[in-house]
């Protein structure tokens, strides 16, 4: 209870009613946000006192909430109040907050030796089925730390769990998917391995193709690696994807929770032909999330560095590198002034320039992301918008007809079954073909940068990037305009090339014809006009989920050609690297312990979904196992199974990847 001998209004800051100690619980209406937070803080203190605890001598949850409530309050009272309790947090012991005390504990692996206890009282991974009412905030299981909003918002927390021996368990394996009417939750865990890259150095590397006319490139390779979760197959099993595309008319990601835990840091010791792997209890790994996208983008769609599809596969993290400039424009040939000016402006990004955690064996980090993006629609149009009419009813529309082969003309009434429409095909470019050979690294259409005065020797390929592909919504005329990708079955050396099939939606594969009195000619290039109608490109389980929309002053309609979701702020890249541990040498040359780190990474995503509802009487097509293939060592194993050698049988055709927009009919 507050002291009996106190001033009636309490010891508050001038102009405030609650911001200060010993004021009454009902002192009138709070004057601002800081005063309102102080009122709530006083009520919490009163409850703690009634329970027999003294909140004035210990830092407690009420103090933590008060700091959090004022984190964006820049008033004088808010700053003073927040600063006071931050100081209290630093010097006062915690009141009954075991987790906070545990996080303060310095985790050496031997510190918990022999301390293994029953985990019945510990929170289990969220493996129970979640109903709609149980999903309160559209998020997977979250850490206790606060969450920053925004598409790329992320927070990290370091903590640990109980364990024994030389390892400290900081979490269990999570997996499986849960389906409700409004949300689907996917949960996956993989074992990962990260090693020292570039001997802890940054390097500039030139990538020069064997064909002198091809695209050369300049790359900055770094000592960092990273995690990439950008593919549907990393999150949905084939059966889960089958269920998603068979039962829901649209879906989109809403929240993602990533946890990196159960870290084990090993030192590699070589003694002649013998190699020993020892636990290193004091070495560390650096880890942070680029939630603000301050560093060049690493997760390009269709890269092979994504989280493995199979839960038992080890995820070997790729090295991070980025392109600092167009190499052809920065060679400074013949002292070219333009190229010299470009070369002098090349940026250099060092990831050590950001705050980050340094974790040791037994510690963990967690990150949260919020998505703000459009839907992936799964319905197909069974007719084009030009046929949205009743063909039995006559129309009042008439048209001007020019007779074949002469200049005579007449006006006639439009037939009921051929009524005109206001809706036009979507845009696209088809009047080009790819330039060979393969080593030239070119595409049917190229977009580049060519500053006046620069000297370009390698041709357009040297300063250009290819569209992928530029068909838009138009019907592909050549293979250049079809989305294609390679599938590399695990454990084999056979690459399979998958080519997209027709999407079966009448708002894709569109064509535009122009009459010339005697016939019609195909318009290969269709620009953007009013009243164009089209559907986005259909995705499959093998597609990337998102792509980062470039930062620019202006842009037209955003519609990635591969169906991925363009995002201003996709999930920030989570970077990781081994800590640098120098060792002495005779000539003071750089020498470091040879270490690596392995651990578990779990990724939980909440997907917002809508079930389909239809008045269609007839059965509709659905994805089934009957459309899959047979393969493997003896050609007896079905797709998405393993053969006698353990090789995973991957799909070999577009339909085996279960594309969207092929099953559920929609009424336009």
UniProtKB/Swiss-Prot annotation:
Entry superkingdom: Viruses
Catalytic activity: a 1,2-diacyl-sn-glycero-3-phosphocholine + H2O = a 1-acyl-sn-glycero-3-phosphocholine + a fatty acid + H(+)
Record's keyword terms, sorted: Capsid protein, Host cytoplasm, Host nucleus, Hydrolase, Lipid degradation, Lipid metabolism, T=1 icosahedral capsid protein, Virion
GO MF annotation: an example: structural molecule activity
Database matches in SUPFAM superfamilies: ssDNA viruses
Region of interest (Disordered), ranges: 107-162
One matching Pfam family: Parvo_coat
BP GO terms, sorted: lipid catabolic process
CC per GO annotation: host cell cytoplasm; host cell nucleus; T=1 icosahedral viral capsid
Biased composition (Gly residues): 147-162
Signal peptide boundaries: none
Chain residue ranges for the region called Phospholipase A2-like: 11-66
Enzyme nomenclature, EC number: 3.1.1.4
Short sequence motif named Nuclear localization signal, residue ranges: 611-622
Enzyme class, UniProt record, top EC level: hydrolase
Family membership noted in the UniProt record: Belongs to the parvoviridae capsid protein family.
Function text: Capsid proteins self-assembles to form an icosahedral capsid with a T=1 symmetry, about 26 nm in diameter, and consisting of 60 copies of three size variants of the capsid proteins, VP1, and VP3, which differ by the presence of an N-terminal extension in the minor protein VP1. The capsid has a channel at the 5-fold axis and there are densities extending the 5-fold axis into the interior of the capsid. The capsid encapsulates the genomic ssDNA.
UniProt free text on domains: The N-terminus of Isoform Minor capsid protein VP1, VP1u, contains a phospholipase A2-like region. VP1u may play a role in the disruption of host tight junctions in the airway tract.
Protein name per its UniProtKB record: Minor capsid protein VP1
